[in-house]
């Protein structure tokens, strides 16, 4: 094995370096006194160096004695190597001690100038404060230097590798120590030369140290720092610290990236990745709920994308923005077209088998012509007795069975003018219209309207001339009147069946039923049964015991208990129960069958369509899509003319809270109220809803100064007491006529009287007695009409009105009078202080007349 020298530098108080020569083949013994200190391990090699710092340097003698410990340690090897120091090296040591003494004196002279350098040394001290601790697998060798720094080395099994590791560590120790000494003793050229010569003499090892020194200086980029030997302990700087610093930098970068990921991507270990369905438009709140993320986090990411600060939960996002946000949270997404969803729902069953179904017959006609009575006679029921004053206020749907297996579905519509929308919706779901005309009244306005609805819907029609049992009934007169409106009876060569009937006497009811079945057979009515159910909402209301109740007619498919339905753009829910018109429970409903369903979350508008969907989530998506379409349509409406806003605000308002039993009644009343128009007053329906009067309705009426209109609903005792305390008026009605009439009366009372100026006389000025600040005293003659005290006077000069005022005082001679008629003279006090010309000035007398206005 080649031998090379390894140098262990022991720092003396003078700053000199003492060298001890060891052979690489020598084996180091282990010191039994091992003190544990602060340490950190570095797996640079299997050899580890533990450096312990001393508190304070001893004197030069103690340093010399400490340096001899290395020489006196037992070394396994040849006995001839025990005295390892040569004579030349001993002389060098003595010279080093002498130089150290000289350097100490020079250091004392320059200590004041080096105070600022000592401050830099503190930072260097902090960097090398931590000792390096390397543990060898076997025994330990304690090497003590004069700086009281202890290096504990453990030999390894392979002595060759162990020798090389010890050599590298000791050489590295010398390199760092020499660097620090050079910084402190720049002027000591002899010592610097000795160290340089020694490093160059080491050959390959010296080159390595130069390379380390160069890399160390390039990385640090700092000037060499001078350390005062009298004040601070010199520490061994290892190149290992550079790698530790790089590791620290890598850890800082890793921490920064981890924090950045938490802020931007919110990536969390074991986070659930969700698949988010993104429609064309979605709100911030809905998107956050779909991802199960906090809304605040979604808003933060959205701010990074758009740069907007004022992001609300209800703001809509398009599909592109939503997809970017979903990816930012490491979720996946799928674009969903809700328009396609709705089309797919309604396209189900188009190519399936068609099965015959029952006809849907709508009974229409003018009010009080006997529509409900006719249905009662056909159904053998007594619905009309349950209606207030015998007037139908709602749409009713019934199904009867004829001849054992033939079924007919009847829809009864109100005949009042206000229910025009109901009749229009009734024709949209019907197959056949039975137009009821009273034989004694003939064709009436709602009869004509019903005929127009039939023509618009292009459905078959049968005319039932009711009350044929009356003595003044004239069938020919009815058929001729129908001819004027384009309805040609079979007796006149047309295709419209006219059946004279009597609901009261039950005349020709079988003929009417047969006519309905005949037309139904001709129409060949069929529908698909084996598909998702869809149809129309006939009526809806809120029941205090059952909640929302909706009357539906199934037009396609089969509706079952447990199905989830969507009705219009605001109501959906699971069908909990179904009942027929007679109150019987039903499990399924086939096409043309009317049923009452329970379970919707909201009251749907009558006339809207319903359809069965797969899940509540799909139901919500469909509702949102329809509401978006509605918002788009509303946004297309023309904006309010700003020039009319001021005039609109000046119009008086009657605030109304409307509560009805069913949605159809609400629409009918709103339709009728909307027809009441006046330029100076209007009705503002502040709130409308289905159900009984509640405390919240009373409180709303109090804050908005409204009246409450209750149609076919009740008010409990507590609500009545609250309304009495708040002085809120609640008006109850059971007939729509009464509501409209009362609203007109209330509006009439709110209208201000119309004031008009009516000329009642003319005065000519005869003499001007005085003109002053208090007015003018004039002598006048009544040329026409009369003049009254306090009347309005318009002073006219050359056909121009130069003054308008009132007569403050009216006298005849010395007496105050109330009026003076034509042909008499009078004196007046006029509130006018300018010059008056008796010859040319004329005064016209006017009286303010108030005209009471009435809303028709």
From Swiss-Prot:
GTP binds at residues 365-372, 412-416, 466-469. Residues 365-372 are annotated as: G1. Pfam families: EF-G_D2 (PF22042), GTP_EFTU (PF00009), IF-2 (PF11987), IF2_N (PF04760). Its main location: cytoplasm. Residues 356-526 form the tr-type G domain. GO terms for molecular function: GTP binding; GTPase activity; translation initiation factor activity. Residues 390-394 are annotated as: G2. Residues 502-504 are annotated as: G5. One of its GO terms (cellular component) is cytoplasm. Residues 466-469 are annotated as: G4. InterPro entries: EF-G-like_DII, IF2_II, IF2_N, P-loop_NTPase, Small_GTP-bd, T_Tr_GTP-bd_dom, TF_IF2_bacterial-like, TIF_IF2. It is found in: Cytoplasm. Residues 412-415 are annotated as: G3. Keywords: Cytoplasm, GTP-binding, Initiation factor, Nucleotide-binding, Protein biosynthesis. PANTHER family: TR-TYPE G DOMAIN-CONTAINING PROTEIN (PTHR43381:SF5), TRANSLATION INITIATION FACTOR IF-2-RELATED (PTHR43381). NCBIfam families: IF-2, small_GTP. One of the essential components for the initiation of protein synthesis. Protects formylmethionyl-tRNA from spontaneous hydrolysis and promotes its binding to the 30S ribosomal subunits. Also involved in the hydrolysis of GTP during the formation of the 70S ribosomal complex. Belongs to the TRAFAC class translation factor GTPase superfamily. Classic translation factor GTPase family. IF-2 subfamily. This is Translation initiation factor IF-2. It comes from Ehrlichia ruminantium (strain Gardel).
